[in-house]
Amino acid sequence: MTVRFGLLGAGRIGKVHAKAVSGNADARLVAVADAFPAAAEAIAGAYGCEVRTIDAIEAAADIDAVVICTPTDTHADLIERFARAGKAIFCEKPIDLDAERVRACLKVVSDTKAKLMVGFNRRFDPHFMAVRKAIDDGRIGEVEMVTITSRDPSAPPVDYIKRSGGIFRDMTIHDFDMARFLLGEEPVSVTATAAVLIDKAIGDAGDYDSVSVILQTASGKQAIISNSRRATYGYDQRIEVHGSKGAVAAENQRPVSIEIATGDGYTRPPLHDFFMTRYTEAYANEIESFIAAIEKGAEIAPSGNDGLAALALADAAVRSVAEKRQISIA
């Protein structure tokens, strides 16, 4: 069976998913929709699909699944529409910026028995998957501490930041999901600090560009997250998990893995410039997992509930900064 896809949204992340879907032998990109015709036409030209409206994709008999890459404030409504239309749904994070709206959306998904996967792509990165396998295989014993470093090469435009929900809901939310994925227990408390160290305009927009978070589970396990909107040396993505018998780490990746030694010292190529190249394999693996859930009934993960759990941690981090205290998770 070939899963026939409709793509909603032809922006930066839409292009990433168009490539992942088109590169899968069990998938076919049938149609793309975007508010900007030129963006949709560019993807249609690159991958041989049609340009249609969202309404047409919703009603189409030749579409089995959709990938939602539209602005965040449209996600929940589109999920509900396509759940009722009987389509399988892959939605980029977050489902919504409001937890109650997410819960209402997930009820529709449950009532319609729709398949919904949320786009936390880092779970599917081969290096991070190997970290999880080392944990599952007992190589490092019982997990005690997770340390996640995630730093963007530069800040997004302020106009984007104003509608993003803030750094915790836009950027750190990936790390909240990864912390849950690796800890093996749900965090029960969140302590966060935040500052504006890079661009005053970000602060004027009501957000931060430099944050740190400590998550703790009921048994005392901890996850420490470091985020920055500036890394002059490239896209900084590292994870270390410390356990009772050892530790496992995934270091930064480079487009070319060479090292040059001369009398002046050692040099290595720069890091990947951003997520589009750093996580190419992750996006492909993510779509592969979604297709397996559609075709074979495999478990869907990350699920809508995973999206809600990550948002709850982001909301708690926002409160922690505002109230300057540790926040308990109900």
UniProtKB/Swiss-Prot annotation:
GO terms for molecular function: inositol 2-dehydrogenase (NAD+) activity; nucleotide binding. Pathway: Polyol metabolism; myo-inositol degradation into acetyl-CoA; acetyl-CoA from myo-inositol: step 1/7. Its EC number is 1.1.1.18. Gene3D superfamilies: Dihydrodipicolinate Reductase, domain 2, NAD(P)-binding Rossmann-like Domain. Coiled coil: none annotated. Keywords: NAD, Oxidoreductase, Plasmid. It is an enzyme of class 1 (oxidoreductase). This is Inositol 2-dehydrogenase. It comes from Rhizobium meliloti (strain 1021).
